[in-house]
Amino acid sequence: MAQADIALIGLAVMGQNLILNMNDHGFVVCAFNRTVSKVDDFLANEAKGTKVLGAHSLEEMVSKLKKPRRIILLVKAGQAVDNFIEKLVPLLDIGDIIIDGGNSEYRDTMRRCRDLKDKGILFVGSGVSGGEDGARYGPSLMPGGNKEAWPHIKAIFQGIAAKVGTGEPCCDWVGDDGAGHFVKMVHNGIEYGDMQLICEAYHLMKDVLGLGHKEMAKAFEEWNKTELDSFLIEITASILKFQDADGKHLLPKIRDSAGQKGTGKWTAISALEYGVPVTLIGEAVFARCLSSLKDERIQASKKLKGPQNIPFEGDKKSFLEDIRKALYASKIISYAQGFMLLRQAATEFGWTLNYGGIALMWRGGCIIRSVFLGKIKDAFDRNPGLQNLLLDDFFKSAVENCQDSWRRAISTGVQAGIPMPCFTTALSFYDGYRHAMLPANLIQAQRDYFGAHTYELLAKPGQFIHTNWTGHGGSVSSSSYNA
C-alpha cells in the first residue's frame, strides 16, 4: 500500500540525517540502500520509533510511494547516479520525480534533465549544504531542474530547510536544468575562499604579531560580534582553543597539507571557461595545492631565503584591526566574484536566477552561513539588476572604510614574507576593477605584432586594425599564433 511521501536512496550519515529531519517534520519516508542490511540496521537503531519505512528492493520502495512518486538520490556523484536512474525509470510513471541531492557536476544534471524529460520523468538536481548537522536539523537547499516538480516537493524541501529571520526557509527554486548544482558549486568555491582568507588572517596573527592561541581565539570571538559574524569564524575560535589529551593545543600538531574534493576546482574551471575573473577562489584552490607539497616545502625552507624575521614594533591592537578589515574587504571581493560567475552562467544557459534569493538560501544551514549574506540579499532587493556587488552603496562604502587597513595588512605581510594569495588577489582585483584604463593595450599590440591578431582603437570601437610593426611582412591577419 502506498503510504510514503518520499523515498531516499543512500544511507550514509547525510542520507540518514535527512530522513530523520523529514520524519521530524511529519513526512513519511521510505529508506533504501544498495546494501540492504543497512536499511534494517537503520530502522533498528537511528530510526527506531519513527514512521520511517524500509524497502529491500527498488520495486518494493516504489510500491510504497504515493503519486507522484518522489525519490531522492544521495549517492556518490557520477556513474552511481546514472546507474540508479537507469534502474528506476522502468519502475516509474510519467510525472514521477527523481531528485539528485549529491554534489553532481552541473553538466551531468543538465544531461539528466534532458534525457528524463524525454521519458516523462521530472528530474531535479539539488545542492544540499550544511554537512551532517545541517542535514539533520536544517540544511540549505538549492533545487533546480524541471520546474514542474517544484510544487510537488516544495513543502518537503522548505519544511526541512534551515530557517532565518522570521522563519524564512533557506530554500527556494533556483532555476532550470543544472542551475541548482551550479549554484551549489559556486557556494563550495566561495567556501574555499572564506576558509583560505581566515587562514591568511591566522597566519598574520601568528607570525607577524606573534599571538598565542588564546589571544587568537579571543580575536576571532570578538570578530564574530562584527560584520564577520559567521559559522567559519565561530568554529575557528573553537579550533584555536581546543586542547589535546596532553593539555597542549591540537592545531599546531595538525599536518599543514589541505585536502580537497574538487568542487572548488570546478568553480575555478568554470570561471576560466566563461571568462569571469574569479581570482580569489582560484587562488584558494592553488593554496591547497601548494600546501600539499609538504615534503618539497620542507626542503625549500632550508634553501630559499626570505626577509629577516624582525619582531613587530607597531601597535598590535591597531594592526589586528587592520587584519580584520582586510579579511572583510577580501570577503566582499570573493562574493562579488562569485555572483559575477552566477550572472555569466545565467546568460550562457538562459537561466533566470534570483540573486537575492540565493543569498538568502546561503544565509543559514550551510557552511558559509553568515550575517554578511543578509547584506547581499538587501543589495539585490534594492537593485535586482545590480551588475556587481561593489557598485552597491553599502558594499562600496564598506570597502572604502576598509581600504587603508587592507593595504597596510598586505604590505606588512609582504615585508614579513607571509604568503597571502587571497588577500593580495582580492586587492589586485579591486584595483583592476576601479581602473578605467589597464595596460592590456600593450598586450593587444604585442599580439598584433607577433600574430597579426589586430586591435581596436579607443576612438574607433568595433573596427579591427593590423599594423605592420616592423616594416616587413604583409598586413593579413595570421592564425599561426593564438596567444
UniProtKB/Swiss-Prot annotation:
Substrate binds at N103, S129, G131, H187, N188, Y192, K261, R288, R447, H453. Pathway: Carbohydrate degradation; pentose phosphate pathway; D-ribulose 5-phosphate from D-glucose 6-phosphate (oxidative stage): step 3/3. NADP(+) binds at residues 10-15, 33-35, 75-77, 103, 478-481. The keyword Cytoplasm applies. Keywords: Acetylation, Cytoplasm, Gluconate utilization, NADP, Oxidoreductase, Pentose shunt, Phosphoprotein. The keyword NADP applies. One of its GO terms (cellular component) is cytoplasm. It comes from the Eukaryota. The active site is at K184 (proton acceptor), E191 (proton donor). Disulfide bonds: none annotated. The modification N6-acetyllysine is found at K38. Pfam families: 6PGD, NAD_binding_2. Its EC number is 1.1.1.44. The modification Phosphoserine is found at S57, S129. GO terms for biological process: D-gluconate metabolic process; pentose-phosphate shunt. GO terms for molecular function: NADP binding; phosphogluconate dehydrogenase (decarboxylating) activity. Catalyzes the oxidative decarboxylation of 6-phosphogluconate to ribulose 5-phosphate and CO(2), with concomitant reduction of NADP to NADPH. Homodimer. Belongs to the 6-phosphogluconate dehydrogenase family. This is 6-phosphogluconate dehydrogenase, decarboxylating. It comes from Ovis aries (Sheep).
